[in-house]
Amino acid sequence: MQHKHIRNFSIIAHIDHGKSTLSDRLIQHCGGLSEREMSAQVLDSMDIERERGITIKAQSVTLNYKARDGETYQLNFIDTPGHVDFSYEVSRSLAACEGALLVVDAGQGVEAQTLANCYTAIDLNMEVVPILNKIDLPQAEPDRVAEEIEDIVGIDAIDAVRCSAKTGIGIEDVLEVIVRQIPPPEGDIDAPLKALIVDSWFDNYQGVVSLVRIVQGELRKNDKIKIMSTGVVHQADKVGIFTPKATDTGILRAGEVGFIVAGIKEIHGAPVGDTITLARAPADAALPGFKKVKPQVYAGLFPISSDDYEDFRDALAKLSLNDASLFFEPESSSALGFGFRIGFLGMLHMEIIQERLEREYDLDLITTAPTVVYEVVTTDGETLYVDNPSKLPPVNSIDEIHEPIVEAHILVPQEYLGSVITLCVDKRGVQTSMTYHGKQVAVTYELPMAEVVMDFFDKLKSTSRGFASLDYNFKHFQTAEMSRLDILINGERVDALAMITHKDNAQSRGRDLVEKLRELIPRQMFDIAIQAAIGNQIVARSTIKQLRKNVIAKCYGGDVSRKKKLLQKQKDGKKRMKSVGNVELPQEAFLALLKVGK
């Protein structure tokens, strides 16, 4: 296949704008799978992806398309996720392509996510081709949306292809546009091999499978390859393409996208964004990779029974083979025993990882409240980064705490603007800009990341009836009055319930939490005092009353001193119980933390 007949592209779209369905149609049209093997969302290979209807991992397909000009073109299509937590997956997929289809729902118009990914594509000098999907819907307004694309994104969209992935209208026009408008790849077949690792995942039988884009040179089966960052040499056992099924071709040439299996045992052996070259004729310099992804949210995960700790560790190691962005380190808590502190990209990522651990590895887990990373300057002038409330230094040795601030871009229809602004102000946000585009308003806020990761996304969706969309990225650290809220049960601090919160909200948060715990902790044979403290100051308290037996029921009349003696005896017994008894915290108590302030 010559260079000029290859097209590499990916699809950018907001969640639910019909990206996966469109890719299904393209595969069907080019005969990539027989009718029998066709299933909805072919490229979403995880069960969770199908159930939640979202795409998490990037996947690729190679299709052959016979165009109207009689030539046969090879289309390499890399699927991308649309959710804000997975935007790094998108930037990787885009780096392997020359063009992108910007798919917009003709009923809903442009959304913030689409915009963010679209700018990523434009920064990479890619050709962006607008496509209006779902034109079969009664509420579709293709002309208005075409204007909106021009107004907000700034691409000419008058002659954008109009199609309906569900009914199959206009699919051929989409393929023609890909062939006509997206440029062919550049790259010299005779130069030394340079291949970019776009994604890697772990296969139980073959080891690491890497999705690669050959930038220059060619790669054949049985070649000795070298990973440039580590310098380790492997042998390429299998080389081929996905038609969505993995098909061995034995060779990949410059400009093509395919997979390579080289018997690598662990994922860090083929890090994403790395360059592969030949051992016998290595390239002189590596390709510019991707920026490392930093976890934004940290939470502790603990197995409910401590016997599962080993299995939990193995499960995490296996998951991190597939998810390069997962970060974890062992942690122990006096309340919950041994577990791990895990870093996530956002709340959706956290939910999905927890669900995969419970579903695929059959574990029962407790999650502590998620926290973000704070920058703490101590009185000695040292700077620490704290992601765990229990690691915060004592109050008297802290000079100042800086909290992470994100820049949030929100696109919202005009009628919901007021409620969105109120929400942002409640979350301690500062508005930096506001522009009107037709019926939509684009607002930019600087918000504390701690507020965004807790429940901001859900609240934004509910105040705007699901129409507002959000994209955010970390901006800088800013001084803030933060303090640690501790929960004491019978005078003992429970490390797993601690949280870092803003001074203004600390008291109300403490009160809410104490009330919640009071409802959740079962009554015992002795009084349980639940307190919320900031430093040494108690801000809220509640008591769970003891259960007591009626010890004087057996006395009929008689002397009062007899009753006193029995009551005193009961009191002493309760006191003794209290000094040795400990309170079992139910799983719901930890979940209550996540829901505080709702």
From Swiss-Prot:
Subcellular location: Cell inner membrane
EC number(s) recorded for this UniProt protein: 3.6.5.n1
Domain tr-type G: residue ranges: 4-186
Iron in keyword set: no
Binding site for GTP: 16-21, 133-136
Keyword Cell membrane: yes
Reactions catalysed according to its record: GTP + H2O = GDP + phosphate + H(+)
Topological relation to the membrane, as annotated: Peripheral membrane protein
Pfam families for this protein: EFG_C (PF00679), GTP_EFTU (PF00009), GTP_EFTU_D2 (PF03144), LepA_C (PF06421)
Record InterPro entries: EF-4, EFG_III/V, EFG_V-like, EFTu-like_2, G_TR_CS, LepA_C_sf, LepA_CTD, LepA_IV
GO annotation terms (biological process): positive regulation of translation
GO cellular component, one term: plasma membrane
GO MF annotation terms: GTP binding; GTPase activity; guanosine tetraphosphate binding; ribosome binding; translation elongation factor activity
Protein family: Belongs to the TRAFAC class translation factor GTPase superfamily. Classic translation factor GTPase family. LepA subfamily.
Protein task: Required for accurate and efficient protein synthesis under certain stress conditions. May act as a fidelity factor of the translation reaction, by catalyzing a one-codon backward translocation of tRNAs on improperly translocated ribosomes. Back-translocation proceeds from a post-translocation (POST) complex to a pre-translocation (PRE) complex, thus giving elongation factor G a second chance to translocate the tRNAs correctly. Binds to ribosomes in a GTP-dependent manner.
Protein's UniProt name: Elongation factor 4
Organism listed in the record: Pseudoalteromonas atlantica (strain T6c / ATCC BAA-1087)
